[in-house]
């Protein structure tokens, strides 16, 4: 499974999100290839899932990947809830 964590510039915030997603997936016992990028580059990628904010998700409407919305990239409980709801 490939997961792409997306923020506006693809550096700071998406890196934090990627680290938190990797930690939550590890706790859940799920293996995945998790990467981070900016919203423009994400349009050309084809992962299984894209995790991003509600605002940036609007820029990815029509994308072939399943979009998972996370509003607080630092909140591992929110990330876990979103992953459980979408990966099940």
Regions found by a protein language model. Name each.
Residues 45-46, 63-64:
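Short, structured coil segments at secondary-structure junctions
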Residues 2-38:
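Conserved active-site segments centered on acidic
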């Amino acid at each position: 499974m490939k997961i792409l964590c997306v923020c506006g510039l693809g550096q700071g915030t998406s890196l934090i999100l990627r680290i938190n997603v990797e930690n939550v997936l590890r706790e859940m016992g799920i293996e995945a290839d998790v990467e981070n990028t900016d919203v423009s580059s994400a349009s050309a990628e084809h992962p299984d899932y894209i995790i991003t904010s509600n605002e940036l998700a609007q820029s990815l409407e029509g994308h072939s990947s399943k979009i998972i919305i996370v509003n607080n990239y630092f909140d591992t409980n929110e990330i876990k809830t979103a992953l459980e709801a979408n990966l099940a």
